[in-house]
Amino acid sequence: MLPLPSELQIQAQSIKQRFSELPVPPDLRDEDIAVLALSDFVSDMLLIHPQWLEELHQQPPQPQEWQYYSQWLSQALAGVQDEAALLTALRLFRRRVMVRIAWSQVLQTSGTAETLQQLSTLAESMIIAARDWLYQVCCRELGTPCNRQGVPQPLLILGMGKLGGGELNFSSDIDLIFAYPENGQTQGGRRELDNAQFFTRLGQRLIKALDQHTIDGFVYRVDMRLRPFGDSGPLVLSFAALEDYYQEQGRDWERYAMVKARLMGGADDPYSQELRQMLRPFVFRRYIDFSVIQSLRNMKGMIAREVRRRGLKDNIKLGAGGIREIEFITQVFQLIRGGREPRLQERALLPTLQAVAELGLLPEQQVADLSGSYLFLRRLENLLQAIADEQTQTLPNDPLNQARLAWGMGYADWAAMSTALENHMQAVRVVFDDLIGDETPDIGEDPSHGLYKSLWQDVLEESDLAPLTPHLEEAARRQLLATISGFRHDVDKRTIGPRGREVLDQLMPRLFAEVCPRPDANVALSRLILLLLSIVTRTTYLELLVEYHAALKHVIRLCSASPMVASQLARYPLLLDELLDPQSLYQPLAPSAYRDELRQYLLRVPEDDEEQQLEALRQFKQAQQLRIAAGDITEALPVMKVSDHLTYLAEAIIDAVIQQAWNQMVARYGQPSHLQQSEGRGFAVIGYGKLGGWELGYSSDLDLVFLLDCPLDVMTDGDRSIDGRQFYLRLAQRIMHLFSTRTSSGILYEVDARLRPSGEAGMLVSTIEAFADYQRNEAWTWEHQALVRARIVYGSPKLHQQFDAIRQQILCRHREDPQLQQEVREMREKMRNHLGSKQRDIFDIKADAGGITDIEFIAQYLVLRYAASEPRLTRWSDNVRIFESMAHYDIMSPEEAAALTRAYVTMRDEIHHLALQEQSSKVAADSFIAEREQVAASWHKWLAANDANVS
């Protein structure tokens, strides 16, 4: 054993002092002092439970003692009579055994592989013991879940990730998926429950038993987001539902996650065998599948962006050459060849690597390097986490913790340990780059010689610039030089360090080589400089633009085309990562893919870290909006598709925000008790306005109305029980808060809830009955106009049906035409007087006569006027399909419907493009003359015999 360095000797003296103050001071041995000096967690636990130290002396930890964990835990739970006692016993058992594992790890009486086995078996033992105890309790309270033949049904638990691979780290959360074999009902209870309800309640209680923080801490943070549909999916699924999901919707990343999936409890009963056989074809393909390399490369790129986004330096898990890259290397062979090579179907990493060597898929020396690096990194990770029982993979920067890790790893000092770490990570990176690594970046011809270099580093005259910009006027060249000079001056005032300066000197000549030949060189450069000033002290982003010449070209193209994109990139430089893959940049996601992409994006963020969750939502929105804008700029997306994509994106975010708010409220108060007997959450969100009409723009706010379905006198079922309707009010307030909180990435969306019954004077959340009553008896005509563009964007099936029925009933009312015509016209005149341009030389595309609002009012009037005789007119909430319906049902001529649609789409297109230019909707008075004349003619025909024509 190495002598303790000075930092740890000081720590040792402090520990001796603390233990000497115990009622019965223990006799501390040298190895005791070493472990206690290395781990605050161990010393804190032994000060609270000094009898555990005596146990360590009398029964020193053994490498194979994991075989007895289940037996020890059974003894610890033998006297447990209720759930509170269960929670206490589980937490104390975990702490006691974790102290033994940390002890053995520091003193190296167990090797790293044995430590990982101990940590994984401990978690598995506790999951299974808690499940079995709670299953018996639930059966007594609710009856036994059985299939249609009366056979009792078990809860099966898949351990994912490192738990599944038997490689759990010291302070890890656990990823689980719950399943049960067959549908059916409970038997022997006071009333029948279907199996889904039974297992959902059991699953909720199991998560609480493991995850809830009490005075004794917690057992494990439980993460259920890897289950089908993530947080928005059922907590527990039947085998049939699991099979349907993975066959029909399983994504590549879910396939990779399933490689390590392992049934907890090690059972070999028929149900366990059935589940394993069902999942195997999804994970391991029969054919050799090389497509996984690109998918894994994409995943690695996402992780690299995450490291940059969160500023994760010195991260031994996610950084280059870290643990994750070794896992990726191993998974490549499993996923490509695992279907044909059973030896590659191992869950644990080290045996899989050994199989890779035996099959000749990698040289033996590389496999030896990878195995050695893996064990080194995993020991370092465990020692790091054992300091304070915290889940971290970031190396410390304080001398005490650096000394702890260096000593624990067997090095005299931090410098020696860092050198060894660097060598290991470099060895991993070499293999990773060879196998999966980023495709060779296209850096183009090196333009850093000659005039482009001089243009950056020397003071040039206008005449010197002429050979590079023969297409520019003299004044434009002078402006270009002034812009460059001003940027140089600004850079000189920044602290960018020698490395930053070196990278900037590489970047600028390359950038000039792309910008100078452009006809809009001055515009492009001025916008690019805003971006460069925002990243000039962040060398990572400068390096990205140097290394990926294609990314630099995309930046120039997009910034030149749109100041909105340029200012977004300048405000949020992490969006530069989106430019690395031109295929995805100019091809936004499929409309149906936004929810799944967001779910995958949020999986990388700790579920209980609200700040990071808020940031991730905002960054996802910005990244997707950039991709939509890129498609818009390059005309890959027509105007209708731009709005469709912006609307699908908003709906995915609404879904995720509600999920977060729901989880937070349920954690605090429990669920409203009536949900145990109903489907869904008793909550719905109605999208009005541009969201309801599939017409969102880049900066649109969201018009939302919240509805609930909850009887009176319902309470929530948590420890801090509150009234059910109060729960839904707080849920809506929480949703508004999550949308509007300003983080470093701004707000998510402006949300306007004033279209709810009684507006700002009304309740934030209405019952469905109150909403219907208000619409029938109190709503003004303009509120019924708004209802034309309303649709449900989130909600339980029951509320969805109820809202649709109410909307149709209200819109199909018989209305007296002269009165309806007058009320619609008066509201339009009021809006025009309030919002119109009032300038003869200006036309406001949105608000002035002949513009978009007139078209919207015509559509709304026609629905309210004719739906009583033709209810099918209420089907759509968007203007284009409303006009199609008017033509289809012979209310409007096909020519007029097509002309109004053309006018509407043309003006909408211009508004999108003005937004990309950061300009308002006000244009020259002689714009859109033909379109305005068509709108005026239709307005005159349907609504305003005496209304002023548009000239």
Curated annotation (Swiss-Prot):
The keyword Magnesium applies. It is an enzyme of class 2 (transferase). Keywords: ATP-binding, Magnesium, Multifunctional enzyme, Nucleotide-binding, Nucleotidyltransferase, Transferase. It catalyses: [glutamine synthetase]-O(4)-(5'-adenylyl)-L-tyrosine + phosphate = [glutamine synthetase]-L-tyrosine + ADP; [glutamine synthetase]-L-tyrosine + ATP = [glutamine synthetase]-O(4)-(5'-adenylyl)-L-tyrosine + diphosphate. Involved in the regulation of glutamine synthetase GlnA, a key enzyme in the process to assimilate ammonia. When cellular nitrogen levels are high, the C-terminal adenylyl transferase (AT) inactivates GlnA by covalent transfer of an adenylyl group from ATP to specific tyrosine residue of GlnA, thus reducing its activity. Conversely, when nitrogen levels are low, the N-terminal adenylyl removase (AR) activates GlnA by removing the adenylyl group by phosphorolysis, increasing its activity. Belongs to the GlnE family. This is Bifunctional glutamine synthetase adenylyltransferase/adenylyl-removing enzyme. It comes from Yersinia pseudotuberculosis serotype O:3 (strain YPIII). The gene is glnE.
